[in-house]
Regions:
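Phosphate-handling substructures
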Residues: 65-95
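Active-site-proximal alpha-helix that buttresses catalytic centers in soluble enzyme cores
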Residues: 2, 7-68
Length: 95
């Protein structure tokens, strides 16, 4: 049986600030690095093929979890939010 698991990248400073990231290549925050480094995946993930977004936050998360990030796929990137990237919801509504 084929199993598919999805894991979101670790936290970034923009996540903490409520900012839209989209395609902007924001790295993990220090708290995000610590959080991902402390996680352990279940044994059923051993030897799994891993596919990640080409964005640094996704690739770094994979490496911190002991996963190879060699299979990058742009289709896994977050939506491109254009001019809204980097803004908070309140900033967008104020425009």
């Amino acid at each position: 049986m084929t199993r598919i698991a999805f894991l979101r990248h670790g936290p970034t400073d923009w996540n903490a600030q409520g900012r839209i990231q989209g395609h902007t290549d924001i790295g993990l925050s220090q708290a995000g690095i610590a959080r991902m480094a402390a996680l352990r995946l279940p044994p059923l993930c051993d030897g799994a093929r891993v596919f990640v977004s080409p964005l640094a936050r996704a690739r770094h998360t994979a490496r911190l979890l002991g996963l190879e990030d060699g299979n990058t796929d742009a289709r896994l990137m977050e939506q491109n939010w254009g001019a809204w990237e980097g803004l908070t919801r309140d900033e967008i509504l104020a425009q």
